[in-house]
């Protein structure tokens, strides 16, 4: 998971005192807005539970802050929150879940109400869940799997995702919803009804399919996703494999279909298209598959040159995701300019490639997931994964989409964001 605070907002309280509101983004999506003093108070509370397990909290300033000091604090808070959300022990605790639930609900002025939330499957079918607006993704996933008949013990192999399907366009996996996020707010804050919440498997090693073969209901989910990958041409079967797979589809032989898919190139990989790269030359198109401990990149340069690059996860030295919003542009998941830059070892030399894709955060999450699935190489999980971003003056506001409810009645006026200068810490 990647935390960033790309924008800040200067406001006044009821007494006329100025303070700074920090907009916290999780993998490119607005998670919450929070004041320094509120985070400081919460840090004191959570410190009583976890002690020195927590990162150091940014110190107070008792003199007026300059613009440079304000930016330094923004970066420090960002680093603090990044370390917090990277600790599964902390993020699964009640004190963490309750606080971030409150932050999200307060940020979007959302009351706790009952509603019917649709959770989709890869074939487009949906289950309807009776949930609350304040239910976490962890809770919603449990409810969805229960309704689908999948045992709770197998829940770790699945997750909720935001996906996007255009009427006559491609299907895209946009992001994984973290366990402490509120799925209704995540989908509610998007701009159109082509976004949806989908339950999908969450592991990068296809051999983990074997862990689900004892559950008929889990096999059904695997089958639906495998069929989707096959029909979307995310995999690359040979002609013989394609004929056999088509026959299995006609016969609705799920186990045989899954068995054959295991032999197909790129089965179980995340497929990313519509990317550009600076390799082998600027503005080269690139198609990416990531999974099974590797990242495969197919480059097509403007001059007609094609090149394939397959990198083992152990060959990657480091990577970082950069969020580059354009000036005077609304900052939203539909208007992101992301790049993923990675360094890799080729022989005795170190090389660097930059890829521009709106799925950069998801790609980064998949790379990290592959590391976590390699217990022999657990030390590589300490690999530095940075998220850089450009601070900008822009508006960030949810747009009405009408996916699950009428939003306008629940929305309040949004204020413009701005970089602050000369604000005393006593006001924060």
From Swiss-Prot:
The protein's name: Sorting nexin-31
Keywords assigned by UniProt, alphabetized: Protein transport, Transport
Record organism: Xenopus tropicalis (Western clawed frog)
Superkingdom as given in the UniProt entry: Eukaryota
InterPro entries to which the protein is assigned, alphabetical: PH-like_dom_sf, PX_dom, PX_dom_sf, SNX17-31_FERM_F1, SNX17-31_FERM_F2, SNX17/31_FERM
Membership in a protein family: Belongs to the sorting nexin family.
Alphabetized Pfam families for the sequence: PX, SNX17-27-31_F1_FERM, SNX17-31_F2_FERM, SNX17_FERM_C
Function: May be involved in protein trafficking.
GO biological process, one term: protein transport
Residue stretches making up the PX domain: 1-107
PROSITE patterns: PX
Gene3D superfamilies: 1.20.80.60, Phosphatidylinositol 3-kinase Catalytic Subunit, Chain A, domain 1, Phox-like domain, Pleckstrin-homology domain (PH domain)/Phosphotyrosine-binding domain (PTB)
């Amino acid at each position: 998971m990647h935390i960033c605070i790309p924008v800040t907002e200067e406001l006044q309280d009821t007494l006329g005192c100025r303070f700074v509101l920090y907009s916290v983004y999780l993998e490119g999506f607005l998670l919450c807005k929070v004041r320094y003093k509120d985070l400081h108070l919460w840090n004191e509370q959570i410190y009583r539970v976890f002690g020195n397990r927590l990162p150091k909290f940014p110190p107070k300033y008792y003199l007026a802050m300059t613009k440079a000091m304000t930016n330094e604090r923004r970066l420090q808070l960002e680093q603090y929150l990044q370390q917090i959300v990277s600790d599964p022990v902390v993020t699964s605790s009640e004190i963490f879940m309750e606080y971030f639930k409150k932050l999200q609900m307060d940020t979007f002025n959302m009351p706790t109400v009952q509603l019917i939330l649709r959770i989709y499957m890869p074939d487009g079918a949906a289950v309807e869940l009776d949930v609350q607006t304040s239910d976490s993704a962890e809770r919603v996933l449990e409810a969805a799997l229960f309704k689908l008949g999948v045992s709770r013990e197998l829940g770790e192999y699945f997750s909720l995702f935001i996906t996007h399907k255009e009427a006559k366009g491609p299907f895209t996996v946009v992001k994984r919803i973290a366990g402490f996020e509120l799925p209704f707010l995540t989908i509610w804050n998007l701009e159109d009804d082509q976004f949806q919440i989908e339950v999908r498997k969450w592991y990068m090693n296809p051999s983990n399919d074997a862990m689900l073969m004892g559950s008929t209901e889990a096999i059904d989910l695997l089958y639906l996703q495998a069929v989707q990958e096959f029909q979307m041409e995310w995999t690359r079967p040979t002609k013989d494999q394609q004929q056999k797979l088509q026959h299995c589809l006609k016969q609705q032989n799920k186990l045989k279909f899954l068995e054959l898919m295991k032999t197909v190139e790129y089965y179980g990989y995340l497929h990313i298209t519509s990317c550009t790269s600076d390799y082998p030359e600027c503005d080269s198109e690139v198609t990416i598959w990531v999974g099974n401990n590797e990242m495969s990149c197919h480059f097509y340069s403007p001059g007609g040159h094609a090149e394939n690059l397959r990198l083992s996860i152990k060959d990657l030295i480091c990577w970082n995701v950069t969020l580059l919003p354009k000036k005077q542009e609304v900052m939203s998941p539909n208007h992101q300019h992301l790049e993923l830059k990675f360094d890799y070892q080729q022989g005795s030399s170190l090389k660097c490639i930059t890829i521009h894709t709106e799925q950069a955060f998801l790609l980064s999450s998949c790379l990290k997931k592959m590391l976590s699935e390699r217990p022999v190489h657990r030390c590589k999980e300490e690999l530095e994964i940075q998220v850089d971003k450009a601070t900008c003056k822009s508006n960030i506001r949810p747009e009405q989409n009408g996916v699950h409810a009428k939003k306008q009645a629940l929305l309040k006026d949004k204020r413009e964001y701005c970089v602050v200068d000369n604000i005393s810490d006593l006001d924060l």
